[in-house]
Regions:
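A residue-level signal for beta-strand positions that form part of recognition/binding surfaces
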Residues: 73-76, 96, 117, 151-153, ...
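Long, charge-dense accessory insertions within large macromolecular proteins
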Residues: 86-89, 162-340
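Two-metal-ion RNase H-like nuclease active-site motif
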Residues: 97-99, 154-156, 270, 310-313
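Surface loops and adjacent helix of pleckstrin homology
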Residues: 111, 122-123, 157, 170, ...
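Arginine/glycine-rich "motif VI" loop of SF2 helicases in the C-terminal RecA-like domain
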Residues: 144-148, 199-200
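Long, non-coiled-coil amphipathic alpha-helical linker/lever segments
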Residues: 148-161
Length: 340
């Protein structure tokens, strides 16, 4: 029974991932996806049965658009998630950490050489992304040239501020001729457009969260915070708070609340907070899986609740010959998805 459930969850979650990453049309809310993902992960740990295409082993989804493909020499992976501050504190292990905004947008990589932006790409499945260099001139805050001649590779999030999305959402349509229901889909559809004209005027912005290559001339090259601060000389504006080594629950909550307030004041779309080690050498020693790096955690906010009406229970036979109850309730919109 557990193996059958694992196979069903993998199939279901991969369908959801394809719709989310390649079609910009999520089929379920983030909360529902996370619930199913956690169930799959727990079953895999209990049984030791893990399929090669399990979402727990990979990140994102292989891009299938007509955009040119870009290979990432350094994989752009995700982070493990938690909803408990106590798990953040246990994870620190006496190390200094950064608290950063977890923006709800599209992970993007920028490459500069000889002071010029030469390539921009999406994360894709972490190994292969899409070339979106042609759309970068439409971004509002990405410099095309910088006073830095060495190679520089930075990753961050492409997004549309919440106030701009509210202003624009009723004036534009997605590929199916329907209004965009959430800012993440709007940003993704804009950034991944084949025609740069579709990205112009959509208020797309970029916020860096990591330096993958370069910036070795900063005072403390092993410090993630120091490298991020160095990006301010090139016009970027990262937001983070750095902790000491003995962080209490009260201070962790304070860091998180300050960042949440900053996001609200600046209309930044967020779905959590990232906690990651400041020391780059220590981060590297933590290792990784096929899905996530082990040098940080993504703190997810508590799920929102929505009211609807349960109309009836239907008993439906499955393809395995079992009879399963199905609750029929009124459609409710969650995270821009019509859930029924």
């Amino acid at each position: 029974m557990s193996v059958k459930r694992i196979k069903n969850l993998v199939k279901q979650l991969n369908e959801y991932r394809h719709a989310y990453y390649n079609q910009d049309a999520p089929l379920v809310s983030d909360a529902e996806y996370d619930r199913l993902f956690d169930e799959l992960k727990e079953l895999e740990e209990q049984t030791g049965f893990i399929l090669s295409n399990s979402p727990t082993q990979t990140v994102g989804y292989y891009p299938v658009s007509e955009l040119a493909k870009v290979t990432h020499p350094i994989p752009l992976l995700s982070l493990e998630k938690t909803k408990l501050i106590s798990e953040l504190l246990d994870f620190m292990k006496g190390q200094e950490v950064l608290f950063m905004l977890k923006l709800d947008g599209l992970t993007t990589k920028l490459i500069y050489e000889d002071g010029r932006l030469i390539q921009a790409s999406t994360r894709g499945d972490g190994e292969v992304g899409e070339d979106i260099t042609h759309n970068i001139p439409a971004f509002l805050n990405v410099p095309l040239t910088i006073p830095h001649k060495e190679r520089l590779v930075i990753t961050g999030e492409s997004f549309i501020p919440t106030n701009d999305f509210e202003r624009l959402k009723d004036t534009l349509r997605d590929g199916n001729g329907k209004p965009y229901k959430n800012g993440r889909n709007f940003a993704s559809g804009s950034v991944r457009s084949l025609d740069p004209k579709n990205c112009i005027g959509r208020c797309v912005r970029f916020l860096p969260f990591n330096v993958l290559e370069g910036m070795e001339d900063v005072p403390f090259p092993d410090s993630r915070a120091c490298k991020l601060e160095g990006l301010t000389h090139f016009g970027y504006c990262p937001f983070f708070s750095i902790s000491g080594t003995g962080l209490s629950k009260e201070y962790a909550e304070k860091f998180i609340q300050e960042l949440v307030s900053t996001a609200a004041n600046l209309h930044l779309p967020i779905d959590g907070i990232v906690m990651i080690f400041d020391s780059l050498s220590y981060s590297k020693s933590c290792g990784k899986t096929g899905h996530h790096y082990k040098d940080g955690l993504a703190y997810k906010f508590e799920d929102d609740t929505y009211e609807t009406f349960l109309r009836e229970i239907e008993w439906t036979p499955t393809r395995f010959g079992e009879i399963a109850p199905v609750g029929i309730f009124d459609t409710v919109e969650i995270d821009g998805c019509d859930v029924s």
